[in-house]
Curated annotation (Swiss-Prot):
Pfam families for this protein: Methyltransf_11
EC numbers: 2.1.1.-
Function text: N-methyltransferase; part of the gene cluster that mediates the biosynthesis of viridicatumtoxin, a tetracycline-like fungal meroterpenoid with a unique, fused spirobicyclic ring system. The first step of the pathway is the production of the malonamoyl-CoA starter unit for the polyketide synthase vrtA. The aldolase vrtJ may be involved in the synthesis of the malonamate substrate for malonamoyl-CoA synthetase vrtB. The polyketide synthase vrtA then may utilize the malonamoyl-CoA starter unit, followed by sequential condensation of eight malonyl-CoA units to form the polyketide backbone.
Primary enzyme class: transferase
SUPFAM superfamilies for this protein: S-adenosyl-L-methionine-dependent methyltransferases
Protein's organism: Penicillium aethiopicum
ATP-binding found in the keyword field: no
Pathway, per record: Secondary metabolite biosynthesis; terpenoid biosynthesis
Name used for this protein in its record: N-methyltransferase vrtF
Gene Ontology biological process terms from the UniProt entry: methylation; terpenoid biosynthetic process; viridicatumtoxin biosynthetic process
Amino acid sequence: MTTTTTTDDTQKLDPSASDEVIYKSWDLLIYEIWVLGIVSTWAWGCSTTEYLLPQFRANVGTNHLDVGSGTGYYLRKGGIPASTRLTLLDLERPALDLGLQRCGRSDARGLQADILQPLPVIDKFDSVSMYYLLHCIPASVEDKCAIFKHIKHNMTPDGVIHGANVLGKGVRNDGHFAAYVRRGVLKAGIFHNLDDNAYDFEHALRMNFEEVETRVVGSVFIFRASRPKLDEGDLLET
């Protein structure tokens, strides 16, 4: 997979949004209603408002990193204090611009980078979120699990990482609607999660964090992990 990493960590929303960004805004508005509303509840069996949004709201710190912000739904609905420093990360610039546009914070910072690689900044975040991101990454489950190994180096000693993703393996049998949706997103190349499973993700979290909480709701793996297992060099930098 070819990826691009930009080390400029002070990107703000370009006021002259391109046609591509405008098109994607409509695309992602549909996503917000369809995926976070209908599909999450009725296909994956995990209500966004009942399970995911409450976890997000309970785990936002004073220096927060949101990875793969999409429509900015969680950032708008998450009750983030005005005093919280907010950074958005995405691989694609149009998606990053859209997140900055819709997050409700004019002072939010944008970071264009590949989450599969170590972050090109030295910031230490006390909270990191990634909701409905991992199942969209075209990578092996091993590479996805490695995200937790390198992102912990950008977290404070008491930092928290939390999120959720749709599993492709070791979950309940899909109903007719879920099977229809799953076939569609796999065929379209939106999902890359055939081997994504709760065991591997939980193992990776426990290898890199002292405290780990996970559960599977329907077909969705929900996680919260805190107190990253940092080495001496990381502790000296904090």
